[in-house]
Amino acid sequence: CAGIRAPQGVYLYHHAVDLARSPDGRWWVMNDRTQAASGAGYALENRLLVSRTFPKLYRDMRVQHLARFFATLRDSLLHFAPRGDGPTLVVLLTPGPFNETYFEHALLSRYLGFPLVEGGDLTVRNGRVWLKTIGGLRRVHAILRRQDDSYCDPLELRSDSALGVAGLT
């Protein structure tokens, strides 16, 4: 991907690929995920669990740490979010606890330090996204989306979606 320029400098932040190894040893791409890319949180949790359960084995295997990947993801989202009044707020948008990857959403939200929100937690007013809190509305500067784009805005995309935020797109 070296030398590729994205339109308006907007790059894809997260991409996941489901791989399978064939009996002859070749790798095959089974699925290509850019919508709600999952897997990184599971890899993180797996490493944390194994490092606590088998600390000597984990050290001896010299497993690559993922902290730098997550720090880069977090820093990139904060850096490229539009500047506004007050501190930059990035949220992780999830379809909710009935989604098969909700565990990962909750884990990533906590690890990255971003509030975990559902569509009902957000509102759009005057072209800006706001997080509804007990203390009032807080401006949202960036959204790490963990649901397919077609479900994000029931006004513009899928009128049957109860997961999105009216006016988000």
Q: PLM features: residue spans?
A:
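Domain-scale recognition of functional cores that engage charged ligands
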Residues: 1-169
